[in-house]
Amino acid sequence: MNHFSKFSVTKRLLILEVLFSAISFGISIYIKVFGRSSIVTFFLLCFHLVPNALFLFPWTIITTSFVDANVFTLLSSILILSVYGVEIERSWGHKEYLLFCQFLTVIPNIAVLIPCFIAYKITDSHYLLVAIIQSTTAIQAGILTAWYQLYSCKKEESSNKFLCPLSKYLIYLFLSIHLFYVFQSFPWTYFCLAVSGTCISELYVLFVHPVVQELFHLESHTQLPI
């Protein structure tokens, strides 16, 4: 069985993350070496700044979900997708896993943008309108939460049995790390994305997943080759 087939949603997510992160890193290096320019600012709006960029480039609300700001978060994302994402995709199938990832890429960003906009209206601080949220944090938190819901509750049979004893603590560790980031002067939005990704994943598994299974007559695809 191939770890990733040509139809794998996980494979496509990994490609997007590496590609967008590389572009983002390249832009950052260009700015440090050559200074800012109108062209660089244009690309920054495409990949970085939300919600300022949202008014000019609506797709940034999605693209920012596939850009990691540093090597640590990128490696963490690759690991979580390659291990836990594969498990969920194998169980749910490609189509539902894609739907699940769409929930995790759009809704958490909106959940962060709304309080930013409200706070801006109250304080009139333009800093709040430049909330950097380029991060796969919501996707990682959502996948970890869904995996915990599926396998730790013995609803499905996990092929990675050595991970089951740790599943109870993974999401709490993940949230704790991102809360620690806030105290280390990292953007507070990362923690907000982690929390919103966790909540959305909980709601999806409890309410949306059973409905999707019923509507489309889907069954568990534990042997799906991905």
Swiss-Prot record:
<feature type="topological domain" description="Cytoplasmic">
    <location>
        <begin position="63"/>
        <end position="65"/>
    </location>
</feature>
<feature type="transmembrane region" description="Helical">
    <location>
        <begin position="192"/>
        <end position="212"/>
    </location>
</feature>
<dbReference type="GO" id="GO:0005794">
    <property type="term" value="C:Golgi apparatus"/>
</dbReference>
<keyword id="KW-0812">Transmembrane</keyword>
<keyword id="KW-1133">Transmembrane helix</keyword>
<feature type="transmembrane region" description="Helical">
    <location>
        <begin position="98"/>
        <end position="118"/>
    </location>
</feature>
<dbReference type="GO" id="GO:0006890">
    <property type="term" value="P:retrograde vesicle-mediated transport, Golgi to endoplasmic reticulum"/>
</dbReference>
<dbReference type="InterPro" id="IPR035952">
    <property type="entry name" value="Rhomboid-like_sf"/>
</dbReference>
<protein>
    <recommendedName>
        <fullName>Protein pdh1</fullName>
    </recommendedName>
</protein>
<feature type="topological domain" description="Cytoplasmic">
    <location>
        <begin position="119"/>
        <end position="191"/>
    </location>
</feature>
<dbReference type="Pfam" id="PF08551">
    <property type="entry name" value="DUF1751"/>
</dbReference>
<feature type="topological domain" description="Extracellular">
    <location>
        <begin position="87"/>
        <end position="97"/>
    </location>
</feature>
<dbReference type="InterPro" id="IPR013861">
    <property type="entry name" value="TMEM115/Pdh1/Rbl19"/>
</dbReference>
<feature type="transmembrane region" description="Helical">
    <location>
        <begin position="42"/>
        <end position="62"/>
    </location>
</feature>
<dbReference type="GO" id="GO:0005783">
    <property type="term" value="C:endoplasmic reticulum"/>
</dbReference>
<dbReference type="GO" id="GO:0016020">
    <property type="term" value="C:membrane"/>
</dbReference>
<feature type="transmembrane region" description="Helical">
    <location>
        <begin position="66"/>
        <end position="86"/>
    </location>
</feature>
<keyword id="KW-0472">Membrane</keyword>
<keyword id="KW-0732">Signal</keyword>
<feature type="topological domain" description="Extracellular">
    <location>
        <begin position="213"/>
        <end position="226"/>
    </location>
</feature>
<feature type="signal peptide">
    <location>
        <begin position="1"/>
        <end position="26"/>
    </location>
</feature>
<feature type="topological domain" description="Extracellular">
    <location>
        <begin position="27"/>
        <end position="41"/>
    </location>
</feature>
<dbReference type="GO" id="GO:0030137">
    <property type="term" value="C:COPI-coated vesicle"/>
</dbReference>
